[in-house]
Every structure is written in structure tokens, then in C-alpha cells.
Design a protein with these regions (language model features):
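Conserved structured core elements
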Residues: 11-16, 34-41, 110, 136
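Secondary-structure transition/capping motifs at alpha-helix termini
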Residues: 6-15, 50-61, 122-126, 153
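Beta-strand segments within the central parallel beta-sheet cores of soluble alpha/beta enzyme folds
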Residues: 14-24, 59-68, 130-133
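Active-site-adjacent substrate-binding region
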Residues: 73-160
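A glycine- and small/hydrophobic-rich beta-loop-beta segment
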Residues: 32-95, 99
């Protein structure tokens, strides 16, 4: 995440940047093409093997990795401002949103939030926070699914809409 926030070329670092897109997110992600399927874990495992990593080194690679789960974020609706926490209400056009939920509906934790927001700050990108209102039911993202399956530290972010 930090390396990706700095201008560079592929030869400047040894990180492997992966972009994964999944199907069936709106119906639970439980398909072979969804985030709950095997594809991302399989690709990362095969990549590690191709680089000569053994099983222990693969676990270490996952532990050193980071994941950005990017989706939409709910911005404040002018007719229903009470549906948002008064101190965490994303506004359209004011930067990406870091999504946080005490019930683990988002994968963000203190470490991944600090990494993400630090990268945004270094890039000169304003960032907002959405903290789920415990009085209002909250959906989820694929972030907790992939984080649970792979053990890769993940931050959930979104564009306010």
C-alpha cells in the first residue's frame, strides 16, 4: 500500500501488485468466481511457488501483504442525515472514505486504517471516515471475506455516493 502510493516503476521495488475483481458480490460472494471462492488464494499461492517460496515463506508473504477492498461508500443523504453518525458522515467530492465497523462488517482495523490514511496523506488526497451507526443495520463488503480466507491485513474504502 505504501509503496503503491509513491511514484515508481516496476523495477524500483520487489513488491508484487495484484488487482482482483470478483463476481456475485451483491448476492453474498459464495461462488467460485466470488470473493469467497478459491481464485485469489490460488493465484497468490501459485505466484509464491513460481518465485520459489515454500509453504512457510508463503505464510510470511501473506503476513507482509496488505489489501485494499474498494467499493462504494454511503454519503450523507440530505433528507436522512440522522442515519449517519454526526461525526462520521461522508460527503460527495471530499475524498475517499475509510470504512470502519465495530461488528466487523468491514475489514478495517487500526493498523490498516493508519497505513491507508498515511498513504492518502503522502499522496495529498483528502480522506474521510465512515463509522457504522450501531442503531442502523449495515451491509458488508468482500473485505472481511478475503481477509478471513487469506489472513491478509485489509482496509475497506469507498468512493462516497
Amino acid at each position: 500500500m505504501i509503496g503503491a502510493a509513491s511514484p515508481s516503476t516496476a523495477s524500483d521495488h520487489k513488491d508484487i501488485l495484484v488487482m482482483a475483481a470478483f463476481d456475485h458480490e451483491e448476492v453474498g460472494s459464495a461462488s467460485r468466481y466470488g470473493a469467497a471462492g478459491p481464485i485469489l488464494g490460488d493465484v497468490l499461492t501459485r505466484t509464491a511457488r513460481a518465485l520459489g517460496a515454500n509453504e512457510e515463506q508463503r505464510f510470511q508473504m501473506f503476513a507482509r501483504s496488505s489489501c485494499v477492498s474498494a467499493d462504494a461508500a454511503h454519503s450523507v443523504h440530505p433528507n436522512f442525515p440522522d442515519k449517519h453518525d454526526p461525526t462520521h458522515h461522508p460527503i460527495i467530492g471530499r475524498g475517499p472514505v475509510t470504512k470502519i465497523n465495530g461488528n466487523q462488517r468491514y475489514a478495517s482495523d487500526a493498523t490498516t486504517v493508519a497505513l491507508w490514511e498515511g498513504a492518502c496523506q503522502r499522496a495529498g488526497v483528502p480522506v474521510q471516515r465512515f463509522v457504522g451507526n450501531n442503531d442502523v443495520p449495515c451491509g458488508s463488503t468482500i473485505g472481511p471475506i478475503s481477509a478471513t480466507r487469506l489472513g491478509i491485513p485489509t482496509v475497506d474504502v469507498g468512493v462516497p455516493m
